């Protein structure tokens, strides 16, 4: 009843939602039955009567129990509800996440102001449109700018990649995510020969570094960028650290961006960067983490597998919901489709998928098996 009140759902709808969630958790309701029930619930809710934020919450709840394809029915109604609401910012974000560049440009032209809420949107559209629309809003940090301006940069994620050492141009910088037990890569087996010039660390990794005082392990990187909130201490006065820019304002459902789009966004805030990305399939692959990229999760004291899981029931699905995997994919798919950034073959395959095809893959890989 508490969640019914927060979501402002009719009692019958709330009861059915609870039945589906609990049933999926204890496996008394199959993935197919749960998906069908969620689709029926979505169809019965009017975008004129339910807020876009409620539809976003239902979208995320569906993904928490691994019903990714079914969640798209709530996604669709989120966008329909936004059309009837008064938020001009959310109208532009809706166009971005529907991959509609023309509509995004049109809304931006009519509505944008110099308010802080618009600057990230303005810069994103400027990159996406190749400078035709939007407003470039580089946030210059002198030392960071000196490292990256007019440079060729390769972001390599933890998944499989078609990139090799031959893919790297002279003086190309390689950027990776570091994690506990993943702070170096074997020069012989790694596709890029173990190169990593700039590192990024999530909040969880930063907490591990701080709790174990392992800052000296960052000396091999020119700079380590941390995902920390504004005003938070970085954690060390001796390591070369900086705070990464978070594209949270580009997310529609109030979700938290994944590290890969965060890295791309942060780097593309520097003028003149030529960015190539690889090793990221947005979890739409059998091996989201290759052998050299599987972390030890210090919060649980267990190692992770090729999915990033320690083996707990429904461990990955809630993470995908919290980060909103589809919105993360869309932010970079838009740029790849317009040639703003380049991608390796596995990433190119995934960003070309329709939302329906992408979610169907996540259903197969994670939802049906309750991973």
Residues covered by each model-derived region:
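Metal-ion/cofactor- or nucleotide/acyl-coenzyme-handling active-site neighborhoods
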Residues: 1-371
């Amino acid at each position: 009843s508490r969640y019914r009140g927060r979501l402002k759902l009719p009692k019958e709808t709330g009861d059915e939602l609870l039945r589906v969630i609990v049933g999926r958790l204890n496996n008394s309701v199959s993935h197919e039955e749960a998906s069908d029930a969620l689709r029926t619930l979505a169809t019965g809710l009017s975008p004129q009567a339910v807020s876009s934020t409620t539809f976003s919450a239902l979208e995320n709840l569906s993904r928490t129990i691994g019903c990714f394809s079914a969640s798209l029915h709530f996604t669709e109604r989120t966008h329909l509800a936004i059309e009837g609401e008064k938020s001009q910012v959310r109208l532009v974000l809706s166009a971005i996440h529907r991959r509609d560049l023309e509509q995004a440009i049109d809304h931006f032209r009519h509505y944008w102001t110099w308010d802080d809420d618009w600057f990230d949107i303005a810069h994103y559209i400027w990159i996406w449109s190749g400078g035709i629309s939007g407003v470039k809003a580089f946030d210059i940090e002198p030392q960071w700018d000196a490292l990256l301006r007019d440079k060729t940069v390769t972001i390599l994620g933890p998944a499989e990649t078609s990139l090799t050492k031959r893919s790297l141009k002279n003086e190309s910088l390689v950027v990776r995510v570091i994690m506990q037990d993943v702070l170096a890569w074997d020069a012989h087996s790694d596709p890029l020969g173990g190169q990593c010039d700039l590192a990024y660390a999530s909040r969880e990794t930063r907490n591990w570094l701080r709790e174990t005082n392992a800052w000296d392990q960052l000396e091999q990187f020119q700079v380590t960028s941390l995902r920390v909130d504004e005003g938070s201490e970085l954690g060390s006065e001796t390591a070369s650290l900086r705070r990464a820019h978070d594209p949270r304002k580009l997310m529609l459902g109030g979700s938290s961006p994944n590290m890969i789009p965060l890295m791309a966004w942060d780097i593309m805030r520097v003028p003149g960067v030529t960015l190539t990305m690889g090793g990221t399939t947005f979890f739409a692959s059998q091996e989201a983490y290759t052998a050299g990229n599987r972390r030890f999760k210090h919060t649980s004291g267990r190692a992770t597998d090729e999915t990033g899981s320690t083996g707990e029931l429904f461990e990955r699905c809630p993470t995908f919901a919290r980060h909103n995997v589809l919105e993360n994919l869309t932010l970079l798919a838009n740029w790849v489709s317009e040639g703003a950034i380049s991608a390796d073959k596995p990433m190119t395959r995934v960003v070309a998928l329709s939302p329906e095809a992408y979610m169907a893959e996540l259903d197969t890989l994670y939802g049906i098996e309750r991973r």
